UniProtKB/Swiss-Prot annotation:
Residues 1-25 form the signal peptide. The gene is sspP. Cleavage leads to the activation of ScpA probably by an auto-catalytic manner. SUPFAM superfamilies: Cystatin/monellin, Cysteine proteinases. Gene3D superfamilies: Cysteine proteinases (3.90.70.10), Staphopain proregion domain (3.10.500.10). This is Staphopain A. GO terms for cellular component: extracellular region. It comes from Staphylococcus aureus (strain MSSA476).
């Protein structure tokens, strides 16, 4: 499937973190670690709308707990660090607000992304949407006591050190330059390195909260054997990755691989024609049928109850999305897999989704048909294929 390259965006960071864990984090509601250094993210300004801040503080633990249960992680305690923003090279924000979720060791486990609603396409009535995933958490944790900048373009995410060399740290599936170098020079005078304020993203902003009660009480439903076995590279095979993951889960096997699926369906294509080919819904249904399944096309997003019932019955669901930002180019259409669903302790219903580009899962409001993805784009969930 085809996609246009988005513009380069940038996030400036200065990181330094002590090796000593935060002391007495459970009991101290006003944590001020003056003797500790923290990850500092450069921002143009630290202003966050009150509605956004309240939404993050109110709901983050429920979202995080749903992912913890999906990952079969133990009960834990979390808090939020200071929120930060991501900028384009013209110093304009990408419009989102990012809240790091800290564990008691002072490391970032998840990123809460709050976005203004994409009004034209979204079925949600809320002004903002919230999504939680690992996103850049591992990257932020890898550069302790170093001054860095994070940049992103169509090739992925880069860490820029003080010598202005950019290292690719998070590759996206949009790579098309076979001669891509792992380091690139960044102009020293670039204005994104001159943002004046700093957000202490690893400084706890409130008392740590245990998710013990939420973990025990919160309803989470998952395809029992769903695992991330491979991720999408420089190709158009999102549907192949999606179907492979779903069939591996529902058959409890490791035999399905995206490339083999694509070769089965397009045996005569070679070279770049094969590399960048995609699949139609009809081809996706046909492949499921050849594997002993009876997939059905639904010309809309599946409801929460439908996801709940299908997942309980070990039937996989493929998401078919259309990119909001551009309907042309590679990945203008994109397939993703439904991992399961959860009902948060505030009653909100969410669907757990795996994007083949990612090494982790993400939460999606069950009433919102626009899915934000890890490169900053949004996909309108317009159809589903269920029964894998």
């Amino acid at each position: 499937m085809k996609r246009n390259f988005p513009k380069l965006i940038a996030l400036s960071l200065i990181l330094s973190l002590s090796v000593t864990p935060i002391a007495n984090a459970e009991s101290n509601s006003n944590i001020k670690a003056k003797d500790k250094k923290h990850v500092q993210v450069n921002v143009e300004d630290k202003s966050i709308p009150t509605e956004v801040r309240n939404l993050a503080q109110k709901d983050y633990l429920s979202y995080v707990t749903s992912l913890d249960k999906i990952y079969n992680k133990e009960k834990a305690s979390y808090t939020l660090g200071e929120p930060f923003k991501i900028y384009k090279f013209n110093k304009k924000s990408d419009g989102n607000y990012y809240f790091p979720v800290l564990n008691t060791e002072g490391n970032i486990d998840y990123i809460v992304t709050i976005s203004p609603k994409v009004t034209k396409y979204s079925s949600s009535s809320s002004k903002y949407t919230i999504n939680v995933s690992p996103f850049l958490s591992k990257v932020l944790n890898q550069y302790k006591d170093q001054q860095i900048t994070i940049l992103t373009n169509s090739k992925g995410y880069y860490v820029v050190t003080q010598n202005h060399k950019a290292k690719l740290v998070l590759k996206t599936p949009r790579l098309e330059d076979k001669k891509l170098k792992k380091t690139e020079s960044i102009p020293t005078g670039n204005n994104v390195t001159q943002l004046k304020q700093k957000a202490s993203v690893t400084m706890p902003t409130s008392q740590f909260k245990s998710n013990n009660y939420t973990y025990n009480e919160q309803y989470v439903n998952k395809l029992e054997n769903f695992k991330i076995r491979e991720t999408q590279g420089n190709n158009g095979w999102c549907a192949g990755y999606t179907m492979s993951a779903l069939l591996n889960a529902t058959y409890n096997t490791n035999k399905y691989h995206a490339e083999a699926v694509m070769r089965f369906l397009h045996p005569n294509l070679q070279g770049q024609r094969f590399q960048f080919t995609g699949l139609t819904p009809r081809e996706m249904i046909y492949f499921g049928q050849t594997q002993g399944r009876s997939p059905q096309l639904l010309n809309r997003m599946t409801t929460y109850n439908e996801v709940d019932n299908l997942t309980k019955n070990n039937k996989g669901i493929a998401v078919l999305g259309s990119r909001v930002e551009s309907r042309n180019g590679m990945h203008a259409g994109h397939a993703m897999a439904v991992v399961g669903n959860a009902k948060l302790d505030n009653g909100q219903e969410v669907i757990i989704i795996w994007n083949p580009w990612d090494n982790g899962f993400m939460t999606q409001d069950a009433k919102n048909n626009v899915i934000p993805v890890s490169n900053g784009d949004h996909y309108q969930w317009y159809s589903s294929i269920y029964g894998y």
